[in-house]
């Protein structure tokens, strides 16, 4: 598979945007009370916040490695882009099924846009 330099450069710039989109969605979901809405996913608010903080710190820690084009980091970034595409799509689909607001619905398009653009640009 051919890896084009301009794809890497674009991906390097898109990854921080995806991390920021994850932060914004985590904030929306927390404020909207997602963690208490579904029994199977019910988490104590403290755990919900700590989990997302740890996740965001991990994702942010990858930014320099992605920026330097380290292959392992680019692969993780692409995997994370796919996870966020699925996450964003699921929030939007559930909102459509419920025909109303679903926590994370407003920020889900950010995950879809940044995730799809990043996954497309990182053809590794």
Specify the residue positions occupied by each region the protein language model found.
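Cytosolic juxtamembrane helix and N-cap/initiation of the first transmembrane helix
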Residues: 1-21
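Membrane-interface helix-boundary motifs at transmembrane edges
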Residues: 3-9, 65-74, 124
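Membrane-interfacial loop-to-transmembrane alpha-helix junctions, especially the N-terminal start
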Residues: 9-16, 72-80
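Core segments of alpha-helical transmembrane spans in multipass integral membrane proteins
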Residues: 17-32, 43-66, 79-82
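"…centered on the first transmembrane helix and the immediately adjacent amphipathic helix/loop
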Residues: 33-37
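Non-cytosolic membrane-interface motifs at loop->transmembrane helix junctions
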Residues: 38-45, 96-110
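Hydrophobic cores of alpha-helical transmembrane segments in multi-pass inner/ER membrane proteins
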Residues: 53-61, 109-121
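Membrane-helix boundary connector in multi-pass membrane proteins
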Residues: 70-71, 81-82, 88-106, 121-124
